[in-house]
């Protein structure tokens, strides 16, 4: 009799699909409801809806590079998502410490890829600020990418300490 393989964490791609769905739904709302480049207060003194566009990457990195960055960041996001999906296929289903961060990054990356391919830029709309200090605008996909990256770093750090203590 052959032994059944352990189920992989690919089921966690459903979380990626939820992130993509929420991201695209929120951006459709923004495009149909918010004026461009006009702050709409949510929490006065801290949070605005602010419809803007980003042709670059995080913090508008390379946003004025002339157009090639659209394809570069699209290819980078698809490549990283493919690598993380491969790692998910090698991860045990119950290993949520690895699976959830991977799935969040995949969902966020693909959400922004959809924007780049549909609009030629990423739609950003969440703006946080204190006084005159404004954080760069972002979206749900960006939040998922950052949350996933933090999870990968933190869980990797803690798991590394745990395995060193066990060894």
Curated annotation (Swiss-Prot):
Molecular-function GO term, any one: endopeptidase activity
UniProt pathway annotation: Protein modification; lipoprotein biosynthesis (signal peptide cleavage)
EC class (word): hydrolase
Gene Ontology CC annotations of this record: plasma membrane
Catalytic reactions of this protein: Release of signal peptides from bacterial membrane prolipoproteins. Hydrolyzes -Xaa-Yaa-Zaa-|-(S,diacylglyceryl)Cys-, in which Xaa is hydrophobic (preferably Leu), and Yaa (Ala or Ser) and Zaa (Gly or Ala) have small, neutral side chains
The protein's Enzyme Commission number: 3.4.23.36
Domain of life: Bacteria
InterPro entries per the UniProt record, alphabetical: Peptidase_A8 (IPR001872)
GO biological process: proteolysis
Topology within the bilayer: Multi-pass membrane protein
The entry's keywords: Aspartyl protease, Cell inner membrane, Cell membrane, Hydrolase, Membrane, Protease, Transmembrane, Transmembrane helix
Any Pfam family hit: Peptidase_A8
Location of this chain's protein in the cell: Cell inner membrane
Chain segments annotated as transmembrane: 10-30, 68-88, 98-118, 138-158
Active site per the UniProt annotation: 124, 142
Record bears the keyword Membrane: yes
Cell membrane as UniProt keyword: yes
HAMAP family in UniProt: LspA (MF_00161)
PANTHER family cross-referenced by the UniProt entry: LIPOPROTEIN SIGNAL PEPTIDASE
Family to which the UniProt record says this protein belongs: Belongs to the peptidase A8 family.
Summary of the function given for this chain in its UniProt record: This protein specifically catalyzes the removal of signal peptides from prolipoproteins.
Record's protein name: Lipoprotein signal peptidase
Phylogenetic lineage: Bacteria, Pseudomonadati, Pseudomonadota, Gammaproteobacteria, Lysobacterales
